[in-house]
Amino acid sequence: MELYLDTSDVAAVKKLARIFPLAGVTTNPSIVAAGKKPLDVLLPELHDALGGKGQLFAQVMATSAEAMVEDARKLRAIINDLVVKVPVTAEGLAAIKILKAEGIPTLGTAVYGAAQGMLSALAGAEYVAPYVNRLDAQGGDGIQTVVELQQLLTLHAPQAKVLAASFKTPRQALNCLLAGCEAITLPLDVAQQFISAPAVDAAVAKFEQDWQSAFGRTSI
């Protein structure tokens, strides 16, 4: 199982990399724009924040297949083992095929349907990213889409992994993992929810109180 953070916040990545068993960091154009750092600055900083060990993802901006391929080459010139995110449009599928032939790994992104995701995997994408909460917000069923996509990949494109994205709650992420997803990417607020547990804090405080009462200290 691969756990990613979906962010451009370098300081947060450095902090959470100490706590979480992170596989890397995903970004998208909106996330990068919010951080106001160009990719040639941001990506090396994220690489360093992960201790030089994690996988990074960044997205093309072009809309034609040929221009997407050029974007991908530029991104790989910044980080040579980067996974290139390509929106799964008709032109995106064509770009994924070309990039596969060039040995450049891709993630099919902006996936709103199981068939769409399967096509990106068949075209050669190593990862497929369904948008769970965005599907729910549009009246769809994000988790069911993930279930169907995972089944399709298991049957017809087992070399590809579902990297589920767009979460508002830890429960959504857990449901994706229960459906068999091999990878998820969490926004910072959801990642924090995973480790924010008032009941656990209360239990630890009670242990300290009892120990202090018995031994006059909180250390062993």
UniProtKB/Swiss-Prot annotation:
CDD domains in the cross-refs: Transaldolase_FSA
Top-level taxon in the UniProt lineage: Bacteria
One Gene Ontology MF term: fructose 6-phosphate aldolase activity
Enzyme Commission no: 4.1.2.-
GO cellular component: cytoplasm
Class of the enzyme per the UniProt entry, highest EC level: lyase
Cytoplasm among keywords: yes
Cellular compartment(s): Cytoplasm
Cystines in this chain: none
GO biological process, one term: fructose metabolic process
Cross-referenced Gene3D superfamilies: Aldolase class I
Subcellular location, principal: cytoplasm
Keywords: Carbohydrate metabolism, Cytoplasm, Lyase, Schiff base
Reaction it catalyzes: beta-D-fructose 6-phosphate = dihydroxyacetone + D-glyceraldehyde 3-phosphate
Active-site residues, record numbering mapped to chain: K85 (schiff-base intermediate with substrate)
Role summary: Catalyzes the reversible formation of fructose 6-phosphate from dihydroxyacetone and D-glyceraldehyde 3-phosphate via an aldolization reaction.
Record family assignment: Belongs to the transaldolase family. Type 3A subfamily.
Complex formation: Homodecamer.
Protein name, as recorded: Fructose-6-phosphate aldolase
Organism: Enterobacter sp. (strain 638)
